[in-house]
């Protein structure tokens, strides 16, 4: 009798874990990206579009793992305030940004080191956004303009 109870409990726990992993992969199919090094020495990272049409990827800010979403419409890398505090980023001068939901005030900052795959940039301009509850960092043009990027089908190719 106890055996069946523990067996069903094990199936339930495993099923819940597998379902959560599947949902996580649907939101962020780029949890472990590979870097391709070309003969010319160019580093390329290929991102897969998620089921919602976005490019979400795990990356690093100042050697701390973060979730990133590519946003070519954003001027700067935009970091939610709660995450900026845990990354120990200093809040600078206020600046007004136009968003899809209207103007917001965010605070200028600099990221010492930002990394996607083996593509590493230093001293990246960013903003700390107090109006966002999420923990996903938007990768805006202050990062993207320093690399090459090409979108083909359901893939975004980053190169440096």
Tell me what each language-model feature is.
Residues 1-67, 72-160:
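Pepsin/retropepsin-fold aspartyl endopeptidases
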